[in-house]
């Protein structure tokens, strides 16, 4: 994806002295292009670190995003600096051999980035269409094979000119020009852009249709399933509970509905984020892949060098703006970016070993002053959950529950308003260990052993995970 230098159109067989450098223009271009390159390098490194440092982002979908960031990082760190120098000087200063290698690496990285977006679009289609079956369809092994195919195909498309599939090179080594051999131009344009673009658009059209249909069905199911007084859908399944056959069927149906709603909501969010990425990709790369074939097949209609350079750098811009898109459209990435920038990776890894803590509080009348900040979830005659806060991905809930009688391990007072706080880090299906105890410890033999009640909870609010 290398453009003609200023004198490349002259088929000269002699080496011209390099033109003088305009100092003011060189400084201006150096600041602009240098800032763009630095932003692209740091931004893509930030994407990679955000996924690497957060275990909840270790999924096949996020590995695809890391692959995209790796391709963009290679482009911004190994190709763009030489492109910027070429632009500033106005001639190629690194020799013929390096020109050919540089052009091949350019095509390799750009094609890998575009094909990576293609794989992501297929992944989102599967995630939205089959949210419950997605983990069995998209496994880590299959994801790795898909990424290997991306890089293998990109390599095949990029190495053609290195083996002679190009027009004769000019003898002037200060000229590094795009490969305008019509056969290769058609092959690379189809393989690098138009075929992936077609797949991407088809997949996202399917995603839009499925998401619209599923949203309508799931939202109507949510409205009929919850009572008028509840603002949050809550499913609690006590382990070893004795219920009738109809109750088991009803509980399973409600659980299946809640899990499907939760998973679909997450996949829909990811599809929206990556839809923005794809939209920016089309806007950035389409001008270049329109200009390049026109210049190759219709020389009389060749665009001006200025138009070509704008289209050329617009394509490069795509590799620098993806790190902006993620935090702006995804709360998940925004928090991950903030943690990395605050150097909280190590701290989060250490704290992830203790995903649940509890503290004892006074009875519920103490919380009456905070009532306006609470979300009450009535779940039974003896139990009530209160949502206290939700910060940095951690949901804090308070449960008020009467303790069971006759417990062999019971060494605490049976206070019907005993309260504990559960800090839950997961945003999806939650298993919460609620430790219940009194506000004042007893002096029994085993007073340090809390009474444990295990609940499996799935939480969602208006179809969104908590």
UniProtKB/Swiss-Prot annotation:
The record's keywords, sorted A to Z, are: Cell membrane, Cytoplasm, Disulfide bond, G-protein coupled receptor, Glycoprotein, Lipoprotein, Membrane, Nucleus, Palmitate, Phosphoprotein, Receptor, Transducer, Transmembrane, Transmembrane helix
Lipid attachment site numbers (S-palmitoyl cysteine): 345
PROSITE patterns from the UniProt entry: G_PROTEIN_RECEP_F1_1, G_PROTEIN_RECEP_F1_2
Q: How does it sit in the membrane?
A: Multi-pass membrane protein
Please give the residue positions where the record annotates the modification Phosphoserine. 215
Cystine residue pairs? 99-176
InterPro entries recorded for this chain? Answer: ADR_fam, ADRA1A_rcpt, GPCR_Rhodpsn, GPCR_Rhodpsn_7TM
Q: What is its main location?
A: nucleus
Record-annotated membrane-spanning stretches: 28-51, 65-88, 100-122, 144-167, 182-205, 274-297, 306-329
Q: Where in the cell is it found?
A: Nucleus membrane; Cell membrane; Cytoplasm; Membrane, Caveola
Residues on the membrane's Cytoplasmic side span: 52-64, 123-143, 206-273, 330-466
State the CDD domains in the record.
7tmA_alpha1A_AR (cd15325)
Of the GO CC terms on this record, one is: nuclear membrane
Motif Nuclear localization signal per record, residues: 334-349
UniProt-listed Pfam families: 7tm_1
The record places the following residue ranges in the Extracellular compartment, namely 1-27, 89-99, 168-181, 298-305
Q: Which family does it belong to?
A: Belongs to the G-protein coupled receptor 1 family. Adrenergic receptor subfamily. ADRA1A sub-subfamily.
Cited function: This alpha-adrenergic receptor mediates its action by association with G proteins that activate a phosphatidylinositol-calcium second messenger system. Its effect is mediated by G(q) and G(11) proteins. Nuclear ADRA1A-ADRA1B heterooligomers regulate phenylephrine (PE)-stimulated ERK signaling in cardiac myocytes.
Q: How does it assemble?
A: Homo- and heterooligomer. Heterooligomerizes with ADRA1B homooligomers in cardiac myocytes. Interacts with CAVIN4.
Q: What is the protein's name according to its record?
A: Alpha-1A adrenergic receptor
Q: Which organism is it from?
A: Bos taurus
Q: What is the lineage of its organism?
A: Eukaryota, Metazoa, Chordata, Craniata, Vertebrata
